[in-house]
Structures are given as structure tokens and as C-alpha cells.
From Swiss-Prot:
Its main location: cytoplasm. Substrate binds at R75, G76, G77, D78, V79, T80, Y81, H82, A155, I156, G157, G168, F169, A170. It is an enzyme of class 2 (transferase). This is Octanoyltransferase. Catalyzes the transfer of endogenously produced octanoic acid from octanoyl-acyl-carrier-protein onto the lipoyl domains of lipoate-dependent enzymes. Lipoyl-ACP can also act as a substrate although octanoyl-ACP is likely to be the physiological substrate.
């Protein structure tokens, strides 16, 4: 099977939501195949279905002053931050296309999240960074060592409707981690966040482009798809040709 891959650069969060909405409908109707969007967002806080507003530590006025948007969305999870230097991925997949891998004729929600985690663990490993899952906590974490506890390097929050996935993951690459001080990331107050840039040892020239290519390759492998790089959303649906243009 083919995984359509779109690298969109940096786009507004509202644009990303609208693009996902249209692609989910197109995937459900069979107009497009499985698709992965890779992109960055300007500074934004998103609150998932399980969010508590107390986990946003900054006032609306301060966020506006800093130019940080805030959106309530229908993904799972609590509050998270997106911003420059962070690779965001939105898989638009029909879980029924993985019928042989799951129960009841499709890949289950928990299995799907584990697969996303696995692709990100392999991506980090491409840069010499060993990561892991942590029981009871979705996402990807560095390994603890000595007195240093594990840190979160990638957050995951998904939505599944009629078997079609949306939302997805955020991998900190060269993210300014000070922006996470605006929130209690994912509602977890006893662990810190980190980035590939801080964790790599033998990759002095770490770039977003390298991480994008690694993530695309690893998602293709984990999900058993051949990756097909596309130039623009219009290559998927003609009506999307101008959606992400400034």
C-alpha cells in the first residue's frame, strides 16, 4: 500500500484543522488513500477532550501578548504546545486498511497509538537517541539514568471517527522548550520535556529536514506502506490547491 506524504512547512493551526477535516472526509469516501501530513505550527496551545484549564498557566492576556493562539480540539489528551522547531504529524488513515493487524477487522485505537509511538522511537534512534514507552503515559520518553528521570520528547493525541484517524503527534526537534512553561504539558507535572537537539550526541548538524525524512521512512516501515512524496495538497484533491498558500 501507498502512504501519501505531504510536507507543508509552517502553517497556521486553523489551516491545519481545515485541511485535516477535508482529508478525513475524502479518506472516508475513498477519494484518497492513507496520508501523512508533516508540518510545523506557529506558537499555539491546544486543549484536548480531557484538558483542564488549570493546566494553562498563563493568562489569555499574556498569551495574546506573546502571540500564542489557543484552540480547543477533539483529540484525546490534555493541553500541549506546538511551535517552531517541532515536527507535527497528522496521519489520515483508514484503520480498516490494517485489518490483518488488528481485531474486529481493523487496527484498534490502542494498537494504533502504539504503532505511532514505535515510528517515533525508531525516528529518534536514527539520531542516536534511545527512547521508550512509559506505562500509563502516552507518548515517547527518553531513558532515565542515575538521578535523571525520563523526559518527554514526543506527545501524541489522536481522534478516530468512522475508522479514520486525525490529529497525531508532536516531536520536539529544535523547539524552544521555554514555551512549555506556559502549561503543564499533557497535564503531567512531575516530568520535564526535552528535544532531539538536547539529546543527540553524535549529530552536530541536526536539521528539521533530516528528521522529516527519517520520520517519513519510519512511518512507512511501521505501517507497512511505501511512502509517496507529494508536492502540495492539490496533488491529493484539486480543491485543496490553495488552502495552505499564504
Amino acid at each position: 500500500m501507498v502512504l501519501n506524504l505531504l510536507h507543508l512547512g509552517r502553517i497556521g493551526y486553523a489551516q491545519g484543522l481545515e485541511l485535516q477535516r477535508q482529508l478525513v472526509e475524502a479518506r472516508h469516501s475513498g477519494r484518497i488513500g492513507n496520508t501523512l501530513l508533516l508540518l510545523e505550527h506557529p506558537p499555539v496551545l491546544t486543549l484536548g477532550r480531557n484538558s483542564e484549564r488549570k493546566n494553562v498557566l498563563a493568562s489569555d492576556e499574556f498569551l495574546a501578548y506573546r502571540g500564542v493562539e489557543i484552540h480547543e480540539v477533539n483529540r484525546g489528551g490534555d493541553v500541549t504546545y506546538h511551535g517552531p522547531g517541532q515536527l507535527v504529524g497528522y496521519p489520515i488513515l483508514d484503520l480498516r486498511s490494517f485489518a490483518e493487524s488488528g481485531e474486529r477487522g481493523r487496527l484498534g485505537a490502542v494498537e494504533y497509538v502504539r504503532w505511532v509511538e514505535e515510528a517515533l522511537i525508531r525516528t529518534c534512534a536514527d539520531f542516536g537517541v534511545q527512547t521508550q514507552r512509559v506505562a500509563g503515559r502516552t507518548g515517547v520518553w527518553t531513558l532515565p539514568g542515575g538521578s535523571v528521570e525520563e523526559k518527554k520528547i514526543a506527545a501524541i493525541g489522536v481522534h478516530i471517527s468512522r475508522g479514520i484517524t486525525s490529529h497525531g503527534f508532536a516531536l520536539n526537534v529544535t523547539t524552544d522548550l521555554r514555551d512549555f512553561d506556559l502549561i503543564v504539558p499533557c497535564g503531567i507535572s512531575d516530568r520535564k520535556v526535552t528535544s532531539l537537539e538536547l539529546e543527540v550526541i553524535d549529530e552536530p548538524a541536526l536539521t528539521m529536514e533530516k528528521v522529516i525524512h527519517s520520520a517519513a521512512r519510519q512511518f512507512g516501515r511501521v505501517f507497512g506502506h511505501q511512502v509517496l512524496w507529494l508536492e502540495s495538497p492539490g496533488d491529493l484533491l484539486p480543491e485543496l490547491a490553495t488552502l495552505t498558500q499564504s
